[in-house]
Amino acid sequence: AGCLSVSALNYLDKDEIKDKNIVCILSGGNNDIMRYPEILEKNLIYLGLKHYYIIEFSQKPKELKKFIINVLGENDDITRFEYIKKTNKNYGNVLVGLETKYNLELEEKLRENNFNFKKIDENDLIYSYLV
């Protein structure tokens, strides 16, 4: 998109381009306002701030509360919470989208609280189907 050339400036060596004229070509003609949420989400994923998991929740009272209190941090945000399929009376798989700065800490808390989970990313075949 049009922001690509400007974003690339961050990767240039500042000393190497000092006192030189740098030109960034902005177009963005293939973009419209409807694509901005997608672009913002891809940026958050690239920066490691947004993650998707399939988490197995026990079908018993207060399981979601346990997840929120014991797993999520103060600055974590649930951006998506969707039951995938209810085939088992005891457990249900949930697609959970999270914005967090501390992904490794979050995964450790999931393990400590006995949640079975799988992180899914753009390389997983199921990613485009679910996300």
Annotate each predicted stretch with a short phrase.
Residues 1-18:
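Active-site-adjacent helical/loop segments in soluble small-molecule enzymes
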Residues 3, 29-30:
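Gly/Ser/Thr-rich helix-start
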Residues 9, 30-31:
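Thiamine diphosphate
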Residues 18-22, 49-50:
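Short coil/turn connectors at secondary-structure junctions
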Residues 24-27:
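Short beta-strand segments
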Residues 33-131:
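A conserved regulatory-domain signal marking ACT and ACT-like small-molecule sensing domains
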